[in-house]
């Protein structure tokens, strides 16, 4: 297995499932309803919905960086505001997250091994560190989502 294949495996485990640590991001989101996703059960903490939009934005930014774009997020892009909390809009948010994840995996799969040690873009961390950061980011926010689900109470 190449290093790129190992990175892809870790990205999939953290996001899709079969992760060593417990439920992956998609597994945690599978039973979340729109009203729960929009709720703020813990004061001064982002909602599940806001976290999903945030993760989607960063997956897209990392994909763009792999493609040579300097992709910087504004505060609004980093933490988008949820304006409509319908079940359709919640599904759109989850679909966007999945699409951005799949597009990032496609970009990673096209990488040559030698690129892993080069800066993702000039003046930034290496491609390898960036991609490990994607996995870490998914796991960090998966933990937040798990805690928010517990704070919401029984489903």
Regions found by a protein language model. Name each.
Residues 2-22, 26-29, 34-80, 119-155:
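Short, contiguous alpha-helical
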Residues 82-118, 129-134:
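Acidic/histidine-rich alpha-helical segments that form the ligand environment
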């Amino acid at each position: 297995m190449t290093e790129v294949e190992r990175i892809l495996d870790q990205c999939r485990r953290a996001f899709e499932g079969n992760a060593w640590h417990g439920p992956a991001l998609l597994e945690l989101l599978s039973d979340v309803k729109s009203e729960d996703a929009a709720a703020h059960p813990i004061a001064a903490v982002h909602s599940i919905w806001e976290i999903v939009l945030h993760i989607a934005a960063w997956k897209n930014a990392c994909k763009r960086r792999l493609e040579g774009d300097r992709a910087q997020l504004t505060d609004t892009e980093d933490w988008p505001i949820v304006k409509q909390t319908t079940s359709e809009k919640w599904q759109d948010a989850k679909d966007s997250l999945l699409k951005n994840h799949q597009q990032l995996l496609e970009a990673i799969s096209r990488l040559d091994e030698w690129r892993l040690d080069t800066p993702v873009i000039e003046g930034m961390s290496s491609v390898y560190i960036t991609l490990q950061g994607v996995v870490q980011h998914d796991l960090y926010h998966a933990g937040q989502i798990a805690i928010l689900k517990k704070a919401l109470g029984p489903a």
